[in-house]
Each structure stands twice: as C-alpha cells, then as structure tokens.
C-alpha cells in the first residue's frame, strides 16, 4: 500500500511525533493497516517481538484520533504501563506532544460490570462507543466465544457483544507475535472479531468462491496432513504448497 492509497490523508498525522519516529517498514505497515481497517474492518499486526508493534499501532491510533474518532486499547494488565505512559503528560513520555487520548482497559475488565479500572468507572462506561479497538496480545482471544457451566460468557463473547457489535462501527486492530498457537482456527477466531462473527460479510469483500469458514477448514486439514510428514519434508515451503490459494 502506497501513501497515495491512504484514505483522508489530510489530517496531519504524518506531522506527528510518533509518525516521524517510525522506521520505513513501520510506516509502510501503518499505512497498510489503515487501508485494511477501512476495507475489511480489521487487521492483525503479527510482527515478531522487538519490531515495534506498539509504535506502529500508536501511529494508526494517531491517524484515527486526528479524525476525532474514539479509541480503546485493550491489553493485559502487565502491559498497561507503556500504553498509559504514551498518552500521559509525563516527562518521560517521548510522544507527549502528540496528546494521544485513547482509553486503556484490561482484558479482564470485559468481565466486570462495576468498580474502577484506573480512573474509569466501569459501571458507567459506554463500551459500544469506540470507533477503533486495539487489542494487545490478541492471541488471548484465540479460543473464540463460549459460555461456562454457570451460563456466563467468556471474554471473547463479551468483547464481541459489548464492544464490537453494538453502537458505532468498530474497527479492530490486533497485535500479536503469536496469533497462531497450534491450529489455524486460532487465527480465524481473532479475525472473526473484525467481521463481527458474520463470515458472509467478508466473503464478498475478499471476492472468494468459498466462505471464510470453508477456507479455514480446508487449511486446517492441510496443516494436519503436513504435521504428519517426516521431519525432512515438514518445511515451511511444503506447507505453503499444500495450502489453498484463497488462504
């Protein structure tokens, strides 16, 4: 994706501090992410650890904040300090001049109906009002929706039903160095957050002959066959040859 393809590239985000701290590959990634968020409503940034996923995501956040859209960062509590620092009026914040204003909440907050998360009163929070949700460590949502024996929805289902489906159109940016654990359905479940669990909506956009569900079912079948090959044959190149073009 070139800079010429960036939608509404007149809001000044390329003059931001965070944009000018990015390496070229991060700028390319940010532009591609914005394009995919607008076209498909979701994107997974799956760069390896140490390649600056957070700063790339912050540039994307700056783009949407400059459009006066509301942004939520959902992260594990152990990762919250950095996200909070980058939007705070702190001397040690290298991005203070960008005045980022996104909200930061924890994955576990999805299961809470009251109490405070930082300064946020969860009993009053309008979860459905966010235009962009950035999910750090999105692989924590790889198992999809479920209901436990007590009839309580898990965090994935709460994310879908409290944040993504209701209210404003919600774009979903997922960050993970390991989006797939040991099955392709891990990836499908995360992507389903972008199409609100309605895979037919993506089939038309992707211009494929098969549904997303069938594509992933076939890919998982090929992966299972590949995993049973002799070690000398179990190469990345062989897996790529076995997977369908649609995947």
Predicted segments with their positions:
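Pre-Walker A (Motif I) flank of P-loop NTPase domains
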Residues: 38-45, 69, 170-171
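P-loop (Walker A) phosphate-binding loop of NTP-binding proteins
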Residues: 48, 76, 178
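Conserved helicase ATPase motor motifs in RecA-like P-loop NTPase domains
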Residues: 167-183
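Conserved pre-motif I regulatory segment
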Residues: 8-44
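Accessory nucleic-acid engagement/destabilization modules that flank
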Residues: 1-3
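SF2 helicase/translocase NTPase motor core
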Residues: 9-21, 54-58, 65-164, 198-247
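A short helix-turn-beta junction within AAA+ P-loop NTPase domains corresponding to the substrate/partner-engaging
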Residues: 187-200
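Walker A/P-loop
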Residues: 40-59
């Amino acid at each position: 994706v070139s800079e010429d393809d960036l939608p509404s590239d007149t809001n000044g985000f390329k003059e931001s501090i965070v944009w000018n701290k990015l390496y070229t590959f991060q700028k390319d990634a940010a532009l591609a992410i914005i394009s995919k968020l607008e076209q498909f409503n979701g994107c997974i940034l799956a760069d390896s650890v140490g390649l600056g996923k957070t700063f790339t995501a912050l540039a994307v956040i700056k783009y949407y904040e400059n459009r006066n859209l509301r942004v939520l960062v959902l992260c594990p509590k152990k990762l919250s300090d950095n996200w909070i620092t980058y939007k705070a009026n702190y001397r040690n914040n290298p991005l203070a001049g960008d005045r980022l204003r996104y909200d930061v909440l924890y994955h576990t907050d999805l299961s809470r109906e009251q109490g405070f998360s930082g300064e946020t009163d969860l009993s009053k929070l309008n979860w459905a009002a966010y235009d962009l949700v950035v999910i750090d460590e999105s692989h924590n949502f790889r198992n999809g929706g479920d209901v436990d024996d007590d009839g309580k929805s898990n965090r994935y289902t709460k994310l879908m039903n409290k944040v993504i489906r209701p209210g404003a159109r919600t774009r979903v940016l997922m960050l993970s160095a390991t989006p797939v654990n040991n099955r392709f359905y891990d990836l499908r479940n995360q992507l389903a957050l972008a199409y609100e669990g309605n895979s037919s909506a993506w089939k038309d956009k992707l211009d494929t002959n098969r549904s997303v569900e069938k594509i992933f079912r076939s890919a998982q079948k090929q992966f299972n066959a590949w995993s049973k090959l002799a070690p000398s044959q179990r190469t990345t190149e062989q897996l790529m040859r076995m997977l369908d073009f649609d995947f």
